[in-house]
Structures are given as structure tokens and as C-alpha cells.
A protein has these predicted regions:
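Acidic, glycine-rich segments characteristic of secretory precursors and extracytoplasmic regions
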Residues: 1-13
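Conserved, well-structured interaction surfaces
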Residues: 21-98, 123-132, 142-157
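Residue register of alpha-helical TPR repeats
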Residues: 82, 89, 162, 167-169
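Short, flexible, mixed-charge acidic loops at enzyme active sites
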Residues: 101-117
């Protein structure tokens, strides 16, 4: 998981006793965090999640979810919709933690990552504006809405969503 541990703050109090020395809250309590090793970092953890999601979005069409092409399309659309929604959510939390006004009076956000990164990626990029980040989040939400079902339930083979029936699936 990109977050390394479950979200819980109780373990950071004197109410909890942990035996797991690799737990991030134990690392915090024992002073083993550094500026380049912050396990609770929104920057690091959210960008890790976005990297995983971007990689998934790039490779999703190549996965054979089913040998039936129509079923494969249904799976692919739903998974892509979930990925767009998760990327928007992670971008929101990243923007909330690191967006803000700069000395030049501009409201900045964070660098927008639309594609997965590799060793040849230029990592020296400037922050995008807050407005551009919000636009990116809304685009991902719109993509998610287009691809996700209205409700999640157990479906039968005859229970095809109307949008796919209209397409002849």
C-alpha cells in the first residue's frame, strides 16, 4: 500500500502499545523520521498512489479481464472509473496539504502527474496553479462518473446497465 499502515491515530497516543517497530507511528514517537523519510507525508504517499494509478490507467486496456469482449469492456470501464476517482481523491488530499499562496501572490497547487514516471522522467517541474489542479480533479471526477455504475450490487448477466444496452452490448 502507498500509505504503509492503516489510517488510525490511536496508536500515536499513550492508549496504545505496539510491538511492531516498523510501524510509522512508532518511528514518529522514537524520532526516527527525517526530512527525506517522512512516512506520514502527504506529498510522498499521495504521489506514490497517483503513480500506481497512472500505471494502472496506462496498462488497463491490455488486461484480459474476461474472454468475452463485452464483459471485458464492462470490467475495464468500471476499473478505469474507479482509478479516475481514486486519482482525483489523492490529488485533492495532496492539494489540500500542499497548495497555497506563494510570495509572488499566485495561488499554487502541486505538479500535475497525468502519466506514470520512469527513470527518464524530468522531475524538475514547477508547481501548477491551484486552478489548474482543481480543473484536473474535476476532469478525473467527470471521467469517473462516465465510467462508473450508478450503484454497486451483484449483477446478473441480464442486468446490463442502460448505457451499454444503448451501445448494443
Amino acid at each position: 500500500s502507498p500509505y504503509n499502515s492503516p489510517v488510525t491515530n490511536e496508536v500515536a497516543t499513550d492508549n496504545a502499545v505496539l510491538n511492531d517497530v516498523s510501524n510509522n507511528w512508532v518511528k514518529l514517537a522514537t524520532g526516527s523520521w527525517t526530512s527525506d523519510n517522512d512516512e506520514a507525508s502527504q506529498w510522498q504517499n499521495r504521489y506514490h498512489a497517483i503513480q500506481y494509478i497512472n500505471t494502472f490507467l496506462e496498462r488497463c486496456d491490455d488486461v484480459i479481464w474476461s474472454t468475452d469482449e463485452n464483459v471485458r469492456r464492462l470490467f475495464n470501464d468500471r476499473f478505469k472509473g474507479e482509478a479516475y476517482g481514486l486519482r482525483a481523491l489523492n490529488m485533492y488530499y495532496l492539494l489540500r496539504a500542499h497548495g497555497g499562496w506563494a510570495d509572488d501572490g499566485v495561488l499554487y497547487g502541486v505538479p500535475i502527474k497525468r502519466d506514470s514516471e520512469n527513470p527518464n522522467t524530468d522531475f524538475n517541474v514547477k508547481r501548477d496553479t491551484f486552478k489548474d489542479c482543481m480543473k484536473f480533479i474535476f476532469e478525473d471526477c467527470e471521467n469517473a462518473i462516465k465510467l462508473l455504475p450508478i450503484d454497486y450490487k451483484e449483477h446478473s448477466e441480464t442486468d446490463v446497465p442502460q448505457v451499454y444496452k444503448d451501445m448494443g452490448i
